[in-house]
């Protein structure tokens, strides 16, 4: 396996040019940022929640989180919402405005919960994604979507900006090498002791690393204590400011 890894890294070093990240994320209507990963446990939910909080603070504007995976309430330290959510909404033949399901988290951040529908995020069809994108585009709120793990081209294609959350993991990068749709940028969760780094990830994915987040225990403690919404770690918000 070591020989295979070394050969693969050598190939990565000579791969195609990585496009520059030229997007800005203004707090304007129709701006939808989709955060996604290729494997569970990559940190997508924490990144999604923290990015929404950072955007609201930096822009002094309303930001909402669409939770397709169901873990955002736990990450934010709020009670699990009851009632319908985005999965129920997508399965309704006649839909009320999606903002009717928004739950306040802070003064400027709200949540559209996953809900109790049987629809899983990896079951989203092109019709589902187009319906959701059209609805979100009608609002003047900036939206961050936690799309969980799995490659959902229909969802990524409808995003203003898509961010792949990934660790420098050989297995994750093997999956990334076969993506049919590339992200606009990468949030790299750095772990000590990994053989792979930023250049390897950029070469395989074909997109620039916008943020390198250290695997910091203070972030985990903040989430475990339910304090992310009220006391986002400074280090986390400072790093995500490069995206926001």
Regions found by a protein language model. Name each.
Residues 58-111:
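Phosphate-binding loop that captures ATP/GTP phosphates
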Residues 1-33, 79-98, 127, 174, ...:
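Acidic-aromatic/histidine active-site loop/patch
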Residues 131, 135-222:
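Conserved catalytic-core segment of NTP-binding enzymes
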Residues 31-35, 63, 112, 141-145, ...:
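Generic beta-sheet signal
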Residues 20-63, 68:
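Walker A (P-loop) phosphate-binding motif
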């Amino acid at each position: 396996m070591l020989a295979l890894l070394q050969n693969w890294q050598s190939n990565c070093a000579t791969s195609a040019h990585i496009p520059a990240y030229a997007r800005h994320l203004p707090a304007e209507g129709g701006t939808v940022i989709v955060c996604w990963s290729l494997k569970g446990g990559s940190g997508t939910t924490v990144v999604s929640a923290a990015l929404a909080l950072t955007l609201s603070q930096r822009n002094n504007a309303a930001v909402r989180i669409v939770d397709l995976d169901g873990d955002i309430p736990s990450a934010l330290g709020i009670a699990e919402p009851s009632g319908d959510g985005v999965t129920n909404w997508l399965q309704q033949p006649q839909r009320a405005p999606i903002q009717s399901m928004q739950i306040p988290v802070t003064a400027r951040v709200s949540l559209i919960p996953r809900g109790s529908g049987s629809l899983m995020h990896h079951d989203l069809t092109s019709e589902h994604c187009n319906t959701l994108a059209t609805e979100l585009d009608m609002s003047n709120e900036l939206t961050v979507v936690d799309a969980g793990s799995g490659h959902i081209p229909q969802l990524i294609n409808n995003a203003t900006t898509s961010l792949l959350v990934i660790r420098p993991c050989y297995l994750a990068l093997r999956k990334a090498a076969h993506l049919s749709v590339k992200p606009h940028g990468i949030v790299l969760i750095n772990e000590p002791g990994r053989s792979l780094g930023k250049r390897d990830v950029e070469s395989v994915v074909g997109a620039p690393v916008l943020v390198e987040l250290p695997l910091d225990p203070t972030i985990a403690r903040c989430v475990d204590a339910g304090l992310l919404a009220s006391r986002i770690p400074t280090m986390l918000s400072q790093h995500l400011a490069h995206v926001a």
